[in-house]
Amino acid sequence: MNKITKARFEIWIKEWDLITKQITDRSGQSGGGLYSFVNDPENMIQEIEQRLGLFLPEDLKDLIRFGYFHAEVDWAFPDGILIPFPNVSEGDLGWNIKDMDFPGLFDDNGDEMQQRRYLAFHMAGNGDLLLFDLESASGSAVVSWSHEEDEFRLLAPSLPDFFERITKLGLIGAYGDSYVPFLGADGLEPDGTNGQLWQAWLKDYRELQWEDVQNDLPAALRLFEMIASDDPELTPRREIGPLLKEYHSVEDILREWIARGEEPQPKRNRRDRLILIGEAMGSDAADWVRTLWTAKAGKDAAERPTSEAPLVARREADSGNDAAQDPAAFLPEADEGVLHRLAAVCLPEDEGLPLVLRDIEREARQSGRRISPPTYSLAAFHSRRVIPWIEPHVSFPFSGWDTLLAASRPQAEDLIRWLQSADALRMTAVSAIGLLPEDEIPALFAGPNGHAERTELLRLLETLHASAVLRKEKTAISEAIAALAFPLT
């Protein structure tokens, strides 16, 4: 494509609007298109050329003559979904021809150098740039500049070629790394292997509906991996299992879903899929989770010093755990974080919580370090039984411990005890009160002593506030007092 026509440009705009609408409708994230127009394009062209001291390439003049001197078109995926290319998580197409300029670049010695080859027309959120290469044959070749690598990457030999290619790829960008999977010698290759894979995936993301795939298990799993984000208000993961079980057996679901981890894909997806399976299937996946823990036990046993081998062998023999002797069964992506989360969401608390606590303690012994806040490992249990375990480990800085305390369903007596304890426990409790969900706070005082317990909590907090010296501490204590300021029925 050698020239932008008004008709083709208007078709692109319709495609961009459709892409952003379909993606944002599904993702629940903000996005859309914003265009700025000019009534006197020829005057704007003259002003820009005078300011820059050059004649604009015809492609840029055409864009201004169509009236579109400025545009912002964007979309974003929610966190937590499984995408085929980890760095492609948003779309960001934009330009501002009126204000484009020559960016200052730096030489190998770190000295800024003046240049008039690359004309920046859009900046990504991380500082990466989209630029025109004025020395290219068309004068409007589009390149990406990565601020971290200080590297230029050709995206298309001309502006119309760029629009055509980036439209096929769903407006990905403008972070420099997001283009890398699709680059060839001549820039972006939407019809290359990765480009075709991405286009097929994005088409399904935009168009697939549950009614289309409910009887097709592989397609249903593909859909849920696309839409099961970390945002519980979008597609709650706990609702996926019951939906699948209406049409498929638990055995078939687990077998097919686990097998998807053997397909070529980013390493991160293999790991995240295991967590998704557990959160979706819950207790239906308990036996599978037990096999993962058994495999981990075998791996840990194989890695112990030789001097410990006889003791390990006796323990395994006593437990009758044959699978634990086979470290080859261990999945590399089933790391401690994965196993701890799966224990929380799939196993009974009486079984899963002791497993995780022992694993955390074992790791601390082996490393010789203090236990850091195991928030990710323990928060998912939402168990008050976590609280007495963490008490002896809490220290300054308490960040992480407060989050874990708030997630562990504390009762008023727990908070009172912590507020009467050492400084680290006291300030952790103060911060945790401010982190408690508003709708959970009344449950603190649901018992027969609720009025007396709240009175004591407020007394302790007010005493702390009166003696606090640092403004940060006073603010945190004030927030805790405010959180407890509601009428008891």
What name fits each language-model region?
Residues 1-128, 177-180, 196-211, 216-220, ...:
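A surface-exposed partner-binding patch
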Residues 139:
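A short alpha->loop->secondary-structure connector
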Residues 473-489:
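Terminal, low-structured helical/coil segments at or just beyond the last alpha-helical repeat
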Residues 145-177:
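Compact, glycine/acidic-enriched structural inserts
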Residues 128-135:
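Broad, structure-driven detector of short, well-ordered beta-strand segments within folded domains
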Residues 409-414, 418-476:
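Extended alpha-helical scaffolding segments
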